[in-house]
Amino acid sequence: MKVRASVKKMCRNCKVIKRNRVVRVICTDPRHKQRQG
């Protein structure tokens, strides 16, 4: 899980979602998981 100021899609499988006012990226590749912090 990477914590970043700006979350971006890193591949075509990445999805940007909002969960409890937190922007997250979920992906099939676990190294691409991010959240905004």
UniProtKB/Swiss-Prot annotation:
Gene Ontology CC terms, in alphabetical order: cytoplasm; ribonucleoprotein complex; ribosome
Plastid keyword on record: no
GO molecular function: structural constituent of ribosome
Species assigned in the record: Francisella tularensis subsp. holarctica (strain LVS)
UniProtKB keywords: Ribonucleoprotein, Ribosomal protein
HAMAP family to which the protein is assigned, alphabetical: Ribosomal_bL36
SUPFAM superfamilies: Ribosomal protein L36
Family: Belongs to the bacterial ribosomal protein bL36 family.
UniProt cross-references to Pfam families, sorted A to Z: Ribosomal_L36
Record flagged with keyword Ribonucleoprotein: yes
Protein name per its UniProtKB record: Large ribosomal subunit protein bL36
Single GO BP term: translation
